[in-house]
Amino acid sequence: MDYEIRQAEKRNIAGFHMVGPWEKTVKQGFEQLMMWVDGNQVVPLEWIAVYYDNPDEVPAEKLRCDTVVSVPDNFTIPKNSEGVILTEIAGGQYATAVARVENHDFATPWYQFFNSLLQDNHYQIAAKPCFEVYLNNGTEDGYWDIEMYVPVQSK
């Protein structure tokens, strides 16, 4: 898979922290997020899923993710936003790749991306969360175009 190494800015994010199998929690988290965004007139800059664990090492019921939108620096959580977190994704050096997800198969592009990165002679994966930015509305289009971000450091 083709990818590039680039510097990413810090992102302020608001949304929901979920624990459990990603096949369920990401969908559930985005359903909650859409209701919260619509109900509070939040204007998202980006729609993002943040992944904290390696599914090959962590049991499915303990996998952590955030389903969030990026928000401006001065954003405050509206009243009656139970369960909403406001945090950030660290800026820094990331490997990035764009992929199209069809048939809800988000795992395949991620595995392809990681396999490519593991063969890189100059960079290694850093112990920080990975995330994906949604470039379209997959529920309307029938597929998702995503930009994947994996933190890296020089070898």
Curated annotation (Swiss-Prot):
SUPFAM superfamilies: Probable bacterial effector-binding domain. It is found in: Cytoplasm. GO terms for molecular function: DNA topoisomerase type II (double strand cut, ATP-hydrolyzing) inhibitor activity. Its main location: cytoplasm. SMART domains: AraC_E_bind (SM00871). Transmembrane segments: none annotated. InterPro entries: AraC_E-bd, DNA_gyrase_inhibitor, DNA_gyrase_inhibitor_GyrI, GyrI-like, Reg_factor_effector_dom_sf. Pfam families: GyrI-like. Keywords: Cytoplasm, Stress response. Belongs to the DNA gyrase inhibitor family. Interacts with DNA gyrase. Inhibits the supercoiling activity of DNA gyrase. Acts by inhibiting DNA gyrase at an early step, prior to (or at the step of) binding of DNA by the gyrase. It protects cells against toxins that target DNA gyrase, by inhibiting activity of these toxins and reducing the formation of lethal double-strand breaks in the cell. This is DNA gyrase inhibitor. It comes from Citrobacter koseri (strain ATCC BAA-895 / CDC 4225-83 / SGSC4696). The gene is sbmC.
